[in-house]
């Protein structure tokens, strides 16, 4: 049973059905399945990695985005592949239509339009709650072996537009007010978070001649491995800026802003602040950049990215009309803030099942995250784990395996007091977690769970074999500056060498297109180049270019694995260890882990804390050995 048909709910319900579980999705409005409530875009820095990982695991977000995207770009294209991010503007109407089409045509999956009012549960002999099903607003009762909550911003949702407050989970949609009570009654810790959205304006009322144009890439990237012959029709976005007059209007109305009057209690997203928050916090800035993003292929409405606000409607109108190009803009939908309940994610196992309530899984904004991609990634993991748990199995991803693993580990071990979003900087091993190798990292899991077919799996394994054999050859063979080799390098436009060099350093020296790289590899003695896919060739180049750094990160992972095997002495005292917070010390004393591996599994114990513990265990052993001497 999946509750909520947003991005998390869609991935959770489809993946569980594909794995063979009879699945039922309950959502408030079927026509709003996977609706893009905020900006009409998917991907970006860090977020693009999540979409690629979802796709590699057999999810649908990448497929849908490629089908309905109206602009595609690579962000950070001038930087290394580890920090690049694919981003697409989407037709938000078609996105929802395609998601609904996939869901309604997925075997084992049924859907109904209702609102869940409460959870059905009981307690076992040890006092742990066991969730059995749900009751809905139309008097129906559903029993299920597993329940996944993907409620988004709908748990006691409260919309703010100036002084006006509406009990909505999204503007115009009702908000379940009682479901949170079930969670609290079972002992789960709830908090309040806040997010917001921008006004939308009629494209016919915009003066585009006054704006900067922002086009997609000439060679548009795509998200899904299923996408072939990709040539989408792309629409431009447009750039404009706030100005001093805009800021004066906002400052003059701080006293009417729910964010500052105390009307809003929830904590908002740090990396997506409202315009009133930006004007207040960055008083020295004379302008803020805004992007006008088309919401559909027809470009009827535009989303003003960067102008999230909950100011009163008359102030919103004055603010928008003070901006260049928008002097006569007609507002079709006003911006608003929304507060909602979330469950403190330290209440979860890494499988996304709640610790206090058996059979209950949570995914998406209910876990304190923000963003479609973060929600979808949790949804697919919750769906996989809920299904596997029927066989007493589970599936988790480590921090060195996927950004999904980084995100879930952050949430479960550290918790969050503000909406959490993924960044590449959150990953310790980001050179290993690139967008381009997501299918290699996760494809085997997808095949194991029946989420990709044998043909796709065979392709993945062939690529893996080609890459491993080629990299192994390149790192163990050299090239000399002979006349024939210098001639060969010159013919490919490559600089000469003066000394003997490893082949892997030659391959990774210069940016080459796929055809030239194939020619170079053939000259260097690789015999099966023609049978390699373009993706494998790309991987060989990237692995060669960053070979030394990648090897270093792999060594760090090996060292971490060894470190986690270290046992904690029985007489080891956690008190007063420099570098450990009081909270960490209290948890270590409470759970008394026998090893660093067990310590690492405790919620709130960070990798940095493990490093400190490892050091002081070493010093403890050293001190004892000195005493014995």
From Swiss-Prot:
Q: Which family does it belong to?
A: Belongs to the MnmG family.
Q: Where in the cell is it found?
A: Cytoplasm
Q: What GO MF annotations does this protein's record show?
A: flavin adenine dinucleotide binding
**Protein name, entry field:** tRNA uridine 5-carboxymethylaminomethyl modification enzyme MnmG
Complex formation: Homodimer. Heterotetramer of two MnmE and two MnmG subunits.
State the gene name recorded for this protein. mnmG
Query: Which Gene3D superfamilies does the entry mention?
Result: FAD/NAD(P)-binding domain (3.50.50.60), GidA associated domain, C-terminal subdomain (1.10.150.570), tRNA uridine 5-carboxymethylaminomethyl modification enzyme MnmG/GidA (1.10.10.1800)
Q: List, separated by semicolons, the cofactors it needs.
A: FAD
UniProt-listed GO biological process terms = tRNA methylation; tRNA wobble uridine modification
Q: Which UniProt keywords apply?
A: Cytoplasm, FAD, Flavoprotein, NAD, tRNA processing
Q: What does this protein do?
A: NAD-binding protein involved in the addition of a carboxymethylaminomethyl (cmnm) group at the wobble position (U34) of certain tRNAs, forming tRNA-cmnm(5)s(2)U34.
Give the binding site residues for FAD.
4-9
**Which interval of the chain is the signal sequence?**
none
Q: Which PANTHER family match?
A: GLUCOSE INHIBITED DIVISION PROTEIN A, PROTEIN MTO1 HOMOLOG, MITOCHONDRIAL
Q: Which residues bind NAD(+)?
A: 268-282
Q: Which GO terms describe its cellular component?
A: cytosol
């Amino acid at each position: 049973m999946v509750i909520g048909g947003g991005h998390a709910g869609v991935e959770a319900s489809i993946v569980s059905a594909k794995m063979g579980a009879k699945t039922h999705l309950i959502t408030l409005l079927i026509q709003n399945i996977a609706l893009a409530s905020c900006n009409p875009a998917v991907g970006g820095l860090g977020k693009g990695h999540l979409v690629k990982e979802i796709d590699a695991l057999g999810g649908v977000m990448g497929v849908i985005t490629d089908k309905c995207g109206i602009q595609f770009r690579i962000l950070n294209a001038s930087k290394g592949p580890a920090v690049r991010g694919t981003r697409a503007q989407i037709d938000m109407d078609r996105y929802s239509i395609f998601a609904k089409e996939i869901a309604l045509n997925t075997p084992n999956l049924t859907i109904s339009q209702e609102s869940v009012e409460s959870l059905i549960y009981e307690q076992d002999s040890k006092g742990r709650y066991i969730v059995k099903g749900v009751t809905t607003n139309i008097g129906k009762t559903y029993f299920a072996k597993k329940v996944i909550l993907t409620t988004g911003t709908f748990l006691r949702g409260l919309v703010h537009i100036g002084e006006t407050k509406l009990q909505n989970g999204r503007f115009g949609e009702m908000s379940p007010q009682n479901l949170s009570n079930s969670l609290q009654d079972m002992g789960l810790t709830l908090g309040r978070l806040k997010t917001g959205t921008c006004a939308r304006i009629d494209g016919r009322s915009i003066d585009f001649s006054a704006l900067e144009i922002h086009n997609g890439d000439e060679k548009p990237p795509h998200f899904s491995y299923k996408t072939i012959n990709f040539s989408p029709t792309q629409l431009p976005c447009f750039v404009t800026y706030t100005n001093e007059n805009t800021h004066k209007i906002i400052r003059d109305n701080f006293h009417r802003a729910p964010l500052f009057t105390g009307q809003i209690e929830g904590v908002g997203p740090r990396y997506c602040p409202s315009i009133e928050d930006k004007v207040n916090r960055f008083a020295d800035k004379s302008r803020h950049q805004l992007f006008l993003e088309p919401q559909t292929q027809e470009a009827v409405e535009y989303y003003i990215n960067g102008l999230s606000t909950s100011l009163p409607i008359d102030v919103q109108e004055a603010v928008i009309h003070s901006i260049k190009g928008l002097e006569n803009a007609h507002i079709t939908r006003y911006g608003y803030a929304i507060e909602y309940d979330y469950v403190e994610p330290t209440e979860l196992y890494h499988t996304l099942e709640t610790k206090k309530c058996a059979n209950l899984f949570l995914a998406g904004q209910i876990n304190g995250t923000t963003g479609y991609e973060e929600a979808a990634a949790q949804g697919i993991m919750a769906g996989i784990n809920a299904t596997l748990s029927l066989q007493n199995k589970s599936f988790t991803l480590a921090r060195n395996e996927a950004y999904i693993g980084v995100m879930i580990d952050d949430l479960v071990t550290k918790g969050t007091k503000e909406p959490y979003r993924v960044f590449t900087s959150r990953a310790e091993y980001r050179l290993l977690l690139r967008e381009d190798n997501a299918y290699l990292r996760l494809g085997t899991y997808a095949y194991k769970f029946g989420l990709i077919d044998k043909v796709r799996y065979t392709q993945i394994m062939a690529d893996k074999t080609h890459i491993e054999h080629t990299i192994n050859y390149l790192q163990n063979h050299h090239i000399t500056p002979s006349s024939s080799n210098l001639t060969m390098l010159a013919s490919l436009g490559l600089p000469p060498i003066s000394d003997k060099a490893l082949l892997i350093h030659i391959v990774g020296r210069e940016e080459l297109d796929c055809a030239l790289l194939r020619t170079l590899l053939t000259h260097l003695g690789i015999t099966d180049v023609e049978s390699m896919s373009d993706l494998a060739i790309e991987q060989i180049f990237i692995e060669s270019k960053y070979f030394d750094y990648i090897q270093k990160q792999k060594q760090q992972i090996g060292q971490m694995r060894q470190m986690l095997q270290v046992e904690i002495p029985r007489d080891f005292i956690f008190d007063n260890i420099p570098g450990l917070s009081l909270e960490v010390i209290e948890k270590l004393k409470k759970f008394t882990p026998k090893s660093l591996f067990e310590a690492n599994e405790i919620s709130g114990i960070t990798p940095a804390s493990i490093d400190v513990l490892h050091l002081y265990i070493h010093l403890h052993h050293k001190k004892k050995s000195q005493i014995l001497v």
